[in-house]
Amino acid sequence: PQGAVLSTGKIDRTRCTTCGNCAEACPTAALVVQGYSVTEEMLFQRVTKEKVFYRDGGGVTFSGGECLLQSEFCAKVLRRLKHAGINTAVDTCGMVERKDLEAVVPFTDTFLYDLKAIDPKVHKRCTGAENEQILENLTYLNKEGANVEVVIPLVKGYNLGEWKKMLVFLKNLERIRTVKLLKYHGFYFSKYEALGWEIPAT
């Protein structure tokens, strides 16, 4: 309806409003909407059905995208999971408002915190965003005594020169106990192709 689906079969993402009408109208089902809406109760019931698998340290991880962009919803479900005795984790890049973290801290056993760069220019070049809020939120979690596992993806040509700076920064956060360096992988290639994006050279 917005002219986002072109005659070539490609999609102009700048025109897409994510209404889903094109997928509904597609006669061959070549266009599909990924994902669906759930209520707090629906998600809680679905997750607790699997409770038997959460023994011996297993649990539920909220991730995304950025799950804390829906922090109020996450907090409600996390609270119920904690009361049900299920271990909880939140995977975040930290690019959220402080109130979003504050909402989930009491109900989160572990934070998986992505850290991509210390130098703000490098971070902006890699992600398109500044990192001041990310570093401030990580410092906040440290002060709160949260259990944080820092995850650092290393990509040649992007942030490989940042890893020492990141470790120096983390050394000053005395409660951070775990840091994982992740080697670059191509798991996201299929997502880029589905979106019609060019896969960056590495």
Residue ranges and their predicted role:
Residues P1-Q2, K10-A29, E66:
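Cysteine-centered iron-sulfur cluster-binding motifs in ferredoxin-type domains/subunits
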Residues A4-S7, L31-Q34, F53, F73:
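Inter-heme linker and motif-flanking segments adjacent to c-type heme-binding CXXCH motifs
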Residues L6-S7, I11-D12, E50, D119:
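Poly-acidic low-complexity segments
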Residues S7, A23-E24, F53, L141:
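A signal for specific C-terminal beta-sheet/loop modules enriched in small/flexible residues
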Residues S7, R13-T17, Q34, G65, ...:
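Short N-terminal micro-motifs specific to bacterial/archaeal maturation
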Residues E41-A194:
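Conserved AdoMet/S-adenosylmethionine-binding subsite of the radical SAM
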Residues E193-A201:
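Short glycine/proline- and charge-enriched loop/turn segments
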